[in-house]
Every structure is written in C-alpha cells, then in structure tokens.
Amino acid sequence: MADLSSRVNELHDLLNQYSYEYYVEDNPSVPDSEYDKLLHELIKIEEEHPEYKTVDSPTVRVGGEAQASFNKVNHDTPMLSLGNAFNEDDLRKFDQRIREQIGNVEYMCELKIDGLAVSLKYVDGYFVQGLTRGDGTTGEDITENLKTIHAIPLKMKEPLNVEVRGEAYMPRRSFLRLNEEKEKNDEQLFANPRNAAAGSLRQLDSKLTAKRKLSVFIYSVNDFTDFNARSQSEALDELDKLGFTTNKNRARVNNIDGVLEYIEKWTSQRESLPYDIDGIVIKVNDLDQQDEMGFTQKSPRWAIAYKFPAEEVVTKLLDIELSIGRTGVVTPTAILEPVKVAGTTVSRASLHNEDLIHDRDIRIGDSVVVKKAGDIIPEVVRSIPERRPEGAVTYHMPTHCPSCGHELVRIEGEVALRCINPKCQAQLVEGLIHFVSRQAMNIDGLGTKIIQQLYQSELIKDVADIFYLTEEDLLPLDRMGQKKVDNLLAAIQQAKDNSLENLLFGLGIRHLGVKASQVLAEKYETIDRLLTVTEAELVEIHDIGDKVAQSVVTYLENEDIRALIQKLKDKHVNMIYKGIKTSDIEGHPEFSGKTIVLTGKLHQMTRNEASKWLASQGAKVTSSVTKNTDVVIAGEDAGSKLTKAQSLGIEIWTEQQFVDKQNELNS
C-alpha cells in the first residue's frame, strides 16, 4: 500500500504540473494523450481504493453528480460594481477627484476581462465555496462547476483562510470549438465568449461545465490580514505565489497620462489576446490610500472601469440577401467578406430595412464599416463612398416575396415591407422555430435544421403537428440516432406541461410579447376564457394596449386557429395558467399590491432579477408611469419616466434604497 500511496502522490504532482502548463502557461510539455492516460490511472485507483481520493484530487476537475438547483448564498462582503469612464475627459475628472483627496498617486492598470465575476473562498488553504456575483449581496453557489476550471487551485500553496475574486471566462479557441460542436448538432450558437462562459457556469451538471474549457483570472483579495502586501501590485504578486492565475498584462503608472498610454496600447492590441476584454480597470495602487478613499453605496471611490467603444472594421459588401420572419417582415441582410469584429468572424450583418440602405447610400460592392451593437449583433454602420468601385449596384427591394411570390406591402406607419400571405412557407417555418424556442415551449433538440427537414418532408405543417411526431418519423432524418430521437420525444412530452403563457407566446400572435402573454395567462387562467374575450375588455388591462388587444382578438377569432387549438388539446397540451397569481401572493406590505416601475440602469442586479423579486413579494411591475403607479425605482440615467413620476408626485426610490429594503426583509 505504501507503493500505491506513493504513486497517488506522484500522479497528483504530475497532473497538477501538466494542467498548469496547459491551462495557465499555454505551454504543455506532454501531449494530451499522456495527460489523459495518467488521469485515467488515478481515476481507476480512486474507484478501487476510495480512501485515496482527496478533496484536491485532479480527478475533481472531471465534474461530479448533477445538481437539482443552485443555492443562494450571501457574500461575506458585497461584490460592488465599478464606476464607468467612456473617454479621456471622464478619466481626467476621475484623476482630479483622486488627487484632490489624497494628493500624489500611483495607478494600477489591468485588463478588464469580458467574463463572469466570481468569488472563491478558501479555508486552511482548500477551496470550499465559489459564488457568482448575483445582485452583489447574494450570489449562486456554483462551487462544483468552478472546481472543473484548471486555473483555480483546489489547494493553495499556504494554508490560509482567504476569499479572492476574479473573472471566469472562455478563451476564444474554446469558444470556437464549442460553437463548431453546437453547429454540428444543429443547436443554437452562443453569440460571444461571455455568454458561453455564463451559460457554462450555470450548468446543473458539472461534467458539462468541465467539457467547456473555461479559465479564470484572479484580480483581488477580500481580506489582506494574512498578506504582506501594501499595494494592489504586491497583492497580485502574492496571489501568484499562492498558485492563483493573475493577468500578467498589468502595469503600474505614475499619472493619468500613463493610464491613457496603457489604454491606447491595449485598444490597438486587444485582438492579439486569446480572450476577450471589454475595457481597462484603473485602481489606486496603494492600499492605505484605497482605505482612505473608501466606497460609495455602489462602488469603490478609488477605482474606475474604462469601457472600449464599439470596434469598427472595414470590409466589402458582397451581396444583400433577404429573410422572412414569422410575422412576414422582410429583412435585408448584408453578405460580407469575412472579417473579425470584437473577437469573432463576421460574414453577415443586419441592414434593418430598405430606408436605412438608401439613407446610408449602401451599395453592393462597396467598402462598408461594420460594428457589433453592444459587442453582440453585427450591423453595417455606413458605406465609404470615396472607395466605391465602378459598377457598385444600388439595391432595390423586390416587389414580391422571395419565398412564396406574394406581393409585398408596407403597412402605414411601418418602415418594413411585409408578406401578408398566411401560407408563406418561410413564415410558417419561422413560426415553428419560434414555437419551440426557450421563452416559448422550450423544446430542446428541435433545432432549425431539423424543423426544416420535418417541414420539407411534410411531417409537420403547423405547431400542433410537433406533438404527433413518432420515433418512425424522426429516425430517418439526418443526424438523428436513437438517443437523440429518445431525448427529443421526451422533450416534446415535457413541453405538454408548460404553463399557458408559454403557449400564448409560442403561438406567435403579432405584438404579443413574453410579458403580455404572462399578463393574459394570469388574468384569464385558461385558453377557453381567452377565446371569449373582447377587444374592449382587453384594452382595460394594464400593459395591454390597443394594438395587442386587436391582434389577440383577431387571431383567436380565426377558425383555422381555433381548429389548431383543438388539435393541441387532442394531444393533451396544457392550456391552463400554472403560475402563482400576483393577487394571491402574501408579500411584504412594503411591496404587496403595489404597482412599481423600473427605469434607468441598475448596477446591483439586472432589471429581470429586480422584476422577479418584486413579483415574488406581490408587487405588479409595469413598463409605463401613470397616475396608478405607486413607486418608481430609478437607476442610473433614468429619463422621461423619472421626470413624469416627479410631475405626478409619485414616490421615487434610488436603486440603493430598493436594495436596502430588500436587505431589511432578508435580515
């Protein structure tokens, strides 16, 4: 047994060394096959001799049993956000404020990694808990998923009690591989590495997270008691010595001009990095000076985040293609010479509508400027007329639908052209894709390509046909083995139990969004009651406007739609509201029964998180301010809604006041 114990220790040392070389230094000394061989040897030993499995074993990286959900845990110290700077003037004002308070200052400049903030707690040197940022006060416990990240040490080099914070992210090569795999499986692609990292960390099965090859950079320590550091730079050096991965592209500078030089350098070099960054973080380096400056209610006074402007690149417009949405809107899409924008290769971009094409004088063959709106959605910003080649073609939208040949119309007050043929194949397919989407019936495994195959094979002609599919229908399809068929049929069966609001949104009624679907489902509770409702009744409901009311009634009066609903009923698709009615929630008197409007940017939680919490307390969250509004919660840059609330004398809370009230209830 002594020999076996010695071999286990040797395997630990080798696997930890090879893992560090591969994931942290990006300089492996052995091939993947050698690492895999040693890992499987250790797994086998631990299976046969469980007494040799330790909490810091390299086999923990593989992932464990799936969880039912993530627990909510309060942070020992709130994870605050940083104030933002968008230009040189903002940075110089920040510098002036710092110098007025503490005099001469040295800054620490660090890359702002575009990922997900996490907090890691160590007890006696062992990693025991990892949380998401959440709303800054409370995060989700994702410890098992974080253990699969090789850049996070399961055991520190010193037996310290400490909490560190960092940014979990997905390297670009991992992102590309993941999307290639999803494309092969006809699954929805991730828009960017940040979304992919967030989605991977929220997997209930940590084995799936382990396959995603995430990484992390640690950027701060929560308590400096066990550290000899006197500055942020020394703290990062200490973290390196303890086995953490910090970002080495940091710099100490003596003044704001040094900050600007650092920003200029990484603005031009950001694409050379193997991961995405979305800005630069500037901190007062001296820890005593940080303490002297302190915090506001939502951020440290001694730090600021400079946000990069949206990156713009030039490429060639090769062609313009048209797509038809589920409501018949015809949208022009630019076909581009492939170009890298904000870390991903772009070959298609939105042109929105014909008016935009003409207003921006965009012609086929032009050199055009492309950017990603919010670093996510590619769009053509403008053409470059001075580089226009001879023969560049002015684009004109067709007069008839490219899918069904029906005449296109422009409805009064709209800029888009629309196909109004209810039997247009392109619209029907898009409607099917919408029906199975996540916010609708959420049928996992029924992707675009499979739906197109099913439609072309005449196995489905409407959404109800999905619930009539059999194993015999699905097995002959491309890339549909027995396991995928079994999983898909199980997902279809599960979708029958969705609540009424999922079905309403999935039907694709024009103007009826997720929130309005929820409102109608909660109000009428069953589809049968909705079938008898009048337009006059609907417009009386808050959040249901004239357009929505007219559209819903017209849709549900259609005999074909009523036949479709009966067809769904025949397959036992649920048509009853399953949620808890707001009026039935016994929330806190501070919130219960009140109509509340959220406006402006929130920093300590998302608008969606705030809305859900308010609903859980019996409040009704609406989108517009009226005389019936009880409270307006105003975040940063609150605009006309705040002004209207002030004019009506409505009670106004800041985000911090709202958070304080939440904390009072939770205490």
Swiss-Prot record:
Which residues carry out catalysis?
Answer: 112
Q: What PROSITE patterns does this protein map onto? A: BRCT, DNA_LIGASE_N1, DNA_LIGASE_N2
Instruction: List, in alphabetical order, the Gene Ontology terms for molecular function in this entry.
Output: DNA binding; DNA ligase (NAD+) activity; metal ion binding
Enzyme Commission code:
6.5.1.2
> If you read the UniProt record, what top EC class would you report for this enzyme, in one word?
ligase
Identify the residues that bind Zn(2+).
401, 404, 419, 424
GO annotation, biological process:
DNA repair; DNA replication
Membrane-traversing stretches: none
One Gene Ontology cellular component annotation held by this UniProt entry: cytosol
- At the top level, the lineage of the source is Bacteria
What keywords does the record list, in alphabetical order?
A: DNA damage, DNA repair, DNA replication, Ligase, Magnesium, Manganese, Metal-binding, NAD, Zinc
Q: Where along this sequence does the record place binding of NAD(+)?
A: 32-36, 81-82, 110, 133, 167, 283, 307
InterPro entries according to UniProt: BRCT_dom, BRCT_dom_sf, DisA/LigA_HHH, DNA_ligase, DNA_ligase_AS, DNA_ligase_CS, DNAligase_adenylation, DNAligase_N
Domain BRCT spans what residues?
586-667
Co-factor(s): Mg(2+); Mn(2+)
Catalytic activity annotation: NAD(+) + (deoxyribonucleotide)n-3'-hydroxyl + 5'-phospho-(deoxyribonucleotide)m = (deoxyribonucleotide)n+m + AMP + beta-nicotinamide D-nucleotide
Q: Which HAMAP family match?
A: DNA_ligase_A
Q: Which family does it belong to?
A: Belongs to the NAD-dependent DNA ligase family. LigA subfamily.
Q: Tell me, in a sentence or two, what this protein's role is.
A: DNA ligase that catalyzes the formation of phosphodiester linkages between 5'-phosphoryl and 3'-hydroxyl groups in double-stranded DNA using NAD as a coenzyme and as the energy source for the reaction. It is essential for DNA replication and repair of damaged DNA.
Under what name is this protein listed? Answer: DNA ligase
Q: Which organism is it from?
A: Staphylococcus aureus (strain bovine RF122 / ET3-1)
| Gene designation | ligA
